[in-house]
């Protein structure tokens, strides 16, 4: 897809309105392949909420290929759970943690939550996720690369905070995150070390959108 088409579809005035666009393709190594495009047209490696939306769309437990790897999933009518492929801490920094949850996140403790987020995003060329306390549910805010603004509920950002929480509290296997949207998600580690994200997904609408030269 051309970046201009993605930007148009994600535009909240002239298009459908979204933080990103998901394209599904056949896969040779999983049930299907997910490609995720940011609102500016750039392609991202992974999206935690995007993975869960795909499972909701298919209405079954499936394996999903993305640029980040293979994600497992569990489908129920009420909640969707997915794994974040190869999620790990890249490096501990003086200011926080650099973490890969399919996409890179800089995780910082900041009582002001969003202060200097844009600066850190460009200094490190990453998504920036800030938290104000490690008391659960952990309140977070994310400045997303490609969106170039706040994402009200970033699944991979929540996963990054869960990894930082696990690093600080090794005996804890469950972490609940509260997003700026007011929604929450639960993150847990299974016996193999895989990081699972679980939460509710709502079907908002469906329709047909026609792209043409005049759009």
Role assignments for model-derived ranges:
Residues 1-77, 99, 106-215:
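A glycine-rich beta-to-alpha transition motif near the start of alpha/beta enzyme domains, typified by
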Residues 82-94, 114-116, 124:
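Active-site glycine-rich loop that binds ribose-phosphate moieties when present
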Residues 86-109:
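Surface-exposed beta-loop interaction hotspot
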């Amino acid at each position: 897809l051309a970046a201009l088409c993605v930007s148009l579809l994600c535009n909240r005035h002239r298009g459908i309105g979204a933080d990103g666009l998901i394209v599904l393709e056949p896969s040779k190594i999983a049930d299907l392949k997910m490609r995720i495009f940011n609102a500016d047209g750039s392609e991202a490696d992974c999206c935690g909420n995007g993975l869960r939306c795909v499972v909701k769309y298919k209405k079954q437990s499936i394996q999903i290929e993305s640029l980040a790897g293979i994600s497992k999933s569990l489908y129920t009518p009420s909640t969707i759970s997915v794994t974040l492929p190869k999620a790990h801490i890249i490096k501990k920094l003086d200011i926080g943690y650099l973490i890969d949850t399919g996409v890179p996140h800089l995780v910082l403790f900041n009582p002001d939550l969003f202060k200097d987020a844009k600066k850190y995003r460009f200094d490190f060329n990453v998504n920036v996720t800030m938290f104000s306390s490690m008391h659960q549910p952990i309140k977070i805010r994310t400045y997303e690369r490609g969106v170039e603004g706040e994402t009200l509920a970033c699944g991979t950002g929540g996963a990054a905070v869960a990894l930082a929480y696990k690093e600080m509290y090794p005996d804890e296997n469950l972490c609940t995150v509260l997003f700026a949207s007011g929604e929450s998600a639960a993150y847990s580690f299974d016996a193999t070390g895989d990081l699972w994200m679980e939460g509710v997904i709502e079907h908002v609408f469906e329709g047909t959108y026609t792209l043409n030269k005049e759009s």
